[in-house]
Curated annotation (Swiss-Prot):
It comes from the Bacteria. InterPro entries: dCTP_deaminase (IPR011962), dUTPase-like_sf (IPR036157), dUTPase_trimeric (IPR033704). This is dCTP deaminase. Pathway: Pyrimidine metabolism; dUMP biosynthesis; dUMP from dCTP (dUTP route): step 1/2. The lineage of its organism: Bacteria, Pseudomonadati, Pseudomonadota, Betaproteobacteria, Burkholderiales. The gene is dcd. It comes from Burkholderia multivorans (strain ATCC 17616 / 249).
Length: 189
């Protein structure tokens, strides 16, 4: 299994719509020249952006967090350019980009150091072979202070690994529960 380069990422995005919308280069400034958290194609990965729709976790109901029976009422929906995550809490969001992962590919997604150095951890599980959809992102604020997440800017980097052989059963073959997800998606069992 080998990591794929910027050339491969560009080719797969342009010829097979692996990433939509696709940015072929690294963007480091907004159209008005303001510095932003970078996004787009890098040497051996693709820096994804966070869309402007968020679910911010609050514990107003003193709920027990149960991944098998998650209380949707524990979230406040928010739409905007900047999301404030409460201290020691988390928020969910989705990517701007829609992904279509080839059958021979598995991805690993890592948070950007800009956020990590501020105590904001980005968690995303691997994109499995033949999975497609918008990626649900989880942001943990590990600090005792409120923390900002910026919509439409880079939040994490996706690394693409291609196997030497095709898997017997892909995510699509087994009817994965998050296949084709469109918005911020809560836990499913």
């Amino acid at each position: 299994m080998s990591i794929k380069s910027d050339k491969w990422i560009r080719r797969m995005a342009e010829e097979h719509k692996m990433i939509e919308p696709f940015v072929p280069d690294q963007v480091r400034a907004s159209e008005d020249g303001r510095r932003i958290v970078s996004y787009g194609t890098s040497s051996y990965g693709y820096d994804i952006r966070c869309a402007d729709e968020f679910k911010i976790f609050t514990n107003i109901n003193s709920t027990i967090v149960d991944p098998k029976n998650f209380d949707e009422g524990s979230f406040v929906d928010f739409k905007g350019d900047v999301c404030i995550i409460p201290p020691n809490s988390f928020a969910l969001a989705r990517t701007v980009e829609y992904f279509r992962i080839p059958r021979t590919v598995l991805t690993v997604c890592l948070g950007k150091s800009t956020y990590a150095r501020c105590g904001i951890i980005v968690n995303v599980t691997p994109f499995e072979p033949e999975w497609e959809g918008y990626v649900t992102l989880e942001f943990s604020n590990t600090t005792p202070l409120p923390a900002k997440i910026y919509a439409n800017e880079g939040v994490a980097q996706v690394l693409f690994f291609e196997s030497d052989e095709v898997c017997d059963v892909s995510y699509a073959d087994r009817g994965g529960k998050y296949q084709g997800q469109r918005g911020v998606t809560l836990p499913k069992t």
